[in-house]
Amino acid sequence: MNPNQKIITIGSICMIVGIISLILQIGNIISIWVSHSIQTGNQNQPEICNQSIITYENNTWVNQTYVNISNTNFVTEQALAPVALAGNSSLCPISGWAIYSKDNGIRIGSKGDVFVIREPFISCSHLECRTFFLTQGALLNDKHSNGTVKDRSPYRTLMSCPIGESPSPYNSRFESVAWSASACHDGIGWLTIGISGPDNGAVAVLKYNGIITDTIKSWRNNILRTQESECACMNGSCFTIMTDGPSNGQASYKIFKIEKGKVVKSVELNAPNYHYEECSCYPDAGEIMCVCRDNWHGSNRPWVSFNQNLEYQIGYICSGVFGDNPRPNDGAGSCGPVSSNGAYGVKGFSFKYGKGVWIGRTKSTSSRSGFEMIWDPNGWTETDSSFSVKQDIVAITDWSGYSGSFVQHPELTGLDCMRPCFWVELIRGRPKENTIWTSGSSISFCGVNSDTVGWSWPDGAELPFTIDK
């Protein structure tokens, strides 16, 4: 083949390759156009997903449904008008307590990222129940958990997570900087109360839907403190009790009426020889009932009830089935403070039913261990120690701690009454165990008028952790 023939042959091959490449490009363009035409045609056939979520936006609860159209999510919204929780129903009749939640936070925290906490409590809106807790700005099994037995520090914050979940950085919502706190929902928004600052001048910061709305300054300059459980709401108003003054003597106690995060009224209790701390409050038939801790001189629990105008009555639970810890053995009760083993105490609760009372208490008379619920049919007004029902919650060989009440409004349950519930803190670590930290998990129960069972639902974590060795 001479040189001219070689050139002609190579040129012909290049031309053929170029033509093939051009044909392929034209085919690619045609296929893209056809694919786009098919996709555009499918827009007339939207696929409706069954997923429905609840979100909070612009102070209005919004029901959102996602419609999947060509891989693009559009949101259709139907606003649900917010309605204030009435709070005027009576407590539901109950025969026992059904297990509601258990977070297993300490067990999971041995290998997972779980907050070091104490003072957990539960509060419910008309849509959900959340666990609130005071963190120590530290995780379990980490060096910053050292020394977290301390109650008040600038690192403590109020946070919340869905009920039954272990409190972690991944599921928790910041609420307030606080070493003492309360929270509740009025049917429209969340009210949070967080107390922080020095012992001689602490300030309570009130937030409504996450926005600061008011503050309350310590009026006795002696460790302003509040409930460590939910406040109580009815007809658009929420109510809380605060204490300022000695933990082992006469202190000052105030009831606050709060609307949309603003204090609209307060009254100081005229309660000589009474001691109120860490009250557990709930609405019942249009009034608020609070059962509290006497850290001064009572092994039975003081109570205060009041209406929306803050007109109040005070007393002590009369039953000889004593509810505090430490306490004497059950015996002769009193409608005033029972002084035997009356010093110190632990946060607790009771539910009043006419002349009767459900009493929650530790099983041990001297340490924060075990837990039980007792029904005393005459215990609110009579001083004997007889009772008719005892339900085991935590065995005496396992640690317990604080306990408190919460309620589920009819707007949440669909019942025509207020469902009584309670939570129990299960404290682990210092000062009773050989660790560098103090934390806790929690369990909760709700009252039912059907079958229940007594058992033990302990924390269950095996200590010490790696950080403790």
From Swiss-Prot:
**GO cellular component terms, A-Z:** host cell plasma membrane; membrane; virion membrane
Active-site annotation: 151, 402
Catalyzed reaction equations: Hydrolysis of alpha-(2->3)-, alpha-(2->6)-, alpha-(2->8)- glycosidic linkages of terminal sialic acid residues in oligosaccharides, glycoproteins, glycolipids, colominic acid and synthetic substrates
**Domain remarks:** Intact N-terminus is essential for virion morphogenesis. Possesses two apical sorting signals, one in the ectodomain, which is likely to be a glycan, and the other in the transmembrane domain. The transmembrane domain also plays a role in lipid raft association.
Give the source's domain of life in one word.
Viruses
Q: How is its activity regulated?
A: Inhibited by the neuraminidase inhibitors zanamivir (Relenza) and oseltamivir (Tamiflu). These drugs interfere with the release of progeny virus from infected cells and are effective against all influenza strains. Resistance to neuraminidase inhibitors is quite rare.
Known role: Catalyzes the removal of terminal sialic acid residues from viral and cellular glycoconjugates. Cleaves off the terminal sialic acids on the glycosylated HA during virus budding to facilitate virus release. Additionally helps virus spread through the circulation by further removing sialic acids from the cell surface. These cleavages prevent self-aggregation and ensure the efficient spread of the progeny virus from cell to cell. Otherwise, infection would be limited to one round of replication.
Question: Which residues form each disulfide bond in the chain?
Answer: 92-417, 124-129, 184-231, 233-238, 279-292, 281-290, 318-335, 421-446
Q: Which cofactor does it need?
A: Ca(2+)
Membrane topology per the entry is:
Single-pass type II membrane protein
Residues with glycosylation annotation: 50, 58, 63, 68, 88, 146, 235
- Where do the record's region annotations for Involved in apical transport and lipid raft association lie? 11-33
Which E.C. number(s) belong to this protein?
3.2.1.18
Q: Where in the cell is it found?
A: Virion membrane; Host apical cell membrane
Which stretches face the Intravirion side? 1-6
HAMAP family named among the record's database cross-references: INFV_NRAM (MF_04071)
List residues binding substrate: 118, 152, 277-278, 293, 368
Recite the other comments. Answer: The influenza A genome consist of 8 RNA segments. Genetic variation of hemagglutinin and/or neuraminidase genes results in the emergence of new influenza strains. The mechanism of variation can be the result of point mutations or the result of genetic reassortment between segments of two different strains.
Q: Which InterPro entries match?
A: Glyco_hydro_34, Sialidase_Influenza_A/B, Sialidase_sf
The protein's name is: Neuraminidase
- Single GO molecular function: exo-alpha-sialidase activity
| Oligomeric and partner information | Homotetramer.
Virion surface topological segments? 28-469
Family affiliation: Belongs to the glycosyl hydrolase 34 family.
* SUPFAM superfamilies referenced in this protein's UniProt entry, alphabetically: Sialidases
